[in-house]
């Protein structure tokens, strides 16, 4: 049970760092853009793959 908790904690930590870096990059891009429609499309494109990877990682860990 302990290795599973350790793996989940590591995954959560790495995902938090990844989301933080993406948010900083997104904020920098938002400052350069004027049209909100382009900004929303970019956020959706960036957010969905991250969520997919996170969910697949969690399902892989729970299957072991």
Swiss-Prot record:
Keyword Cytoplasm attached: no
Q: What main location does UniProt list?
A: secreted
Residue span(s) of the pro-peptide: 23-46
Q: Where in the cell is it found?
A: Secreted
One GO cellular component term = extracellular region
Q: Name one GO biological process term.
A: defense response to bacterium
Signal peptide range in chain numbering: 1-22
Keywords assigned by UniProt?
A: Amidation, Amphibian defense peptide, Antibiotic, Antimicrobial, Cleavage on pair of basic residues, Fungicide, Immunity, Innate immunity, Secreted, Signal
Q: What does this protein do?
A: Antimicrobial peptide with activity against Gram-positive and Gram-negative bacteria and against fungi. Has been tested against S.aureus (MIC=2.5 ug/mL), B.pumilus (MIC=7.5 ug/mL), B.cereus (MIC=75.0 ug/mL), E.coli (MIC=5.0 ug/mL), B.dysenteriae (MIC=20.0 ug/mL), A.cacoaceticus (MIC=60.0 ug/mL), P.aeruginosa (MIC=2.5 ug/mL) and C.albicans (MIC=2.5 ug/mL). Also shows a weak hemolytic activity.
**The name this protein goes by in its record:** Temporin-ALh
